């Protein structure tokens, strides 16, 4: 990884105050299930909620048909579609209680 590799910076919830570098070609899955790379405790989060991937075109997030949705900058994203992320974007997972910012 290089210094310009995007990072997820926890703002609230289970991941608050932590930073996680996004590796190329290895999705970071998020949810309540123990098999997820990022396990989030909130009841608003689905077992397999969403995943973030670094592609050749940049960082994308995909909601995995979660019950309470995933928001990017306050707007709920459609399920099962890659949505581009850029530095400074704020992502809410299930609710504003679990969120991170792209750095």
Q: Where does each model-flagged region fall?
A:
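C-terminal boundary/linker segments immediately following FHA domains
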Residues: 30, 65, 71-103
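Residue at a beta-strand N-cap/secondary-structure junction
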Residues: 44-45, 58, 82
